Amino acid sequence: DASECLQIFSDQENYFPSSVQVSVAPRSQLSKISTIVQTAGLFSIDYGSSFKVITEHMAKEQYVLVQCGAPNVTEAEIDAVAPLPSQQHTRKTFRVPLRQIATESTVQLSYLHELGLADRVEFTSKYAVGPCWQKSKACNGGYEGAWGDAVTKATQDASVDAIFVDCSAAPCSSSSNPKEVHFSASQDPGPLNTAEHIKFMAAFFNKEDQANTIFAKTLRDYNNLIQAPAANAPKVAWIEFAAQSSWSAESFKVSMAGYKTRYITHAGGLNLDVSAMQSSLGSKLVVADVVPGVPLSGQKLTLATSGYSSKSEASTAFFAALADVDVVIDETYAPTPSSYSFSSFLTNFDLTSASALPFIANQKVFRIDGTISSENNLDWFESRLMHPQWVLGDLKDALHGTGGSRKYLRNIAASESPQVITSSSCTTLLPACNDATTSEAIPMLFTPASVSSAMRHAVP
């Protein structure tokens, strides 16, 4: 679209003026409780006059984003703006705004939705939840990904400008595919850090001004919800039962992932004391980093039932260590979330409804499947990343009974059912469905100054 690209280029113009640039907020600004804010960010953005450079620290990649219609930039010009941090870092170049993209997972989708970019997503994750993503999948818009059919994936990759991917472990090695972009939102350690990745996404589409506005509101809404925990605040545990499988022994688990413990603290709750659990369960309790080698990711605690004479005995020991927990969030996998009930919970954890445990006696047993797709995929793994304020609101209601509605948390002890999202509510015209041949135009970020014709030259 002519309105998205330069028709005449001037080396005297600044096509990305400071008024529309993004800057990654200092970590100390991302929470009122400064003691729990992490100081590490996973990306940074620097601007030249006609290009911008995103440095993605986890993948050790730089993405050079050149305004369409501007001439190519040299390595020396890029180095003057953002030199490579190390010899391990590599560079990839894209023309922005991107026209058509693919997304490997659900992680990126809520960011794209908030920026109004659904009409630029040609292929999306087959596990997507949002109405328009489900509509796209039904029109053969499902992305094959690394584990799909290689021939189909190659065809899909060839038809798009970029493929947004993520990884689940560190270090996340750079990809040799020149179109792949690593989106590290799910690896950033804090709820607001994660939400700030909307600025990363926006830079590929010249939507920085919109991203600044969205994130400012998210930051304000989240901080307005923060509640410092009192001494007698409810104690919360994120638990899971893992059945025997070819890759896992039967076990009871507790997640102390960094983002989860921060959410609980911000909601005015108390987290488990890992040392106390270790004292109670001894060497039978295995404690490890959620992401191996990354302490900031938090800890996962595993108690194998094989260390006891029976599952029942293991359950007794496990819940003796959780005897003062007021609220549990059960993350046990269920292929059909709507069929997972309070009875399922009791069976999995070898408990009875007559138990004196506070979370059973007071009906405080929640799951994270409060909103799902028609194909049983959880919105928790999609929109939560972009909307930490929604999660915090859910948790405050679960802990303190604020009377608000909840999007992600479902109280199975109170027989609540999941809300199911379908494609019928999507009204966006999508490329995968041949609703439209072009995407909605994205205006350039600058207003051209008056430049003499002698200083201007058309771009070849």
Residue ranges and their predicted role:
Residues D1-A458:
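N-terminal ligand-binding lobe of clamshell/alpha-beta domains
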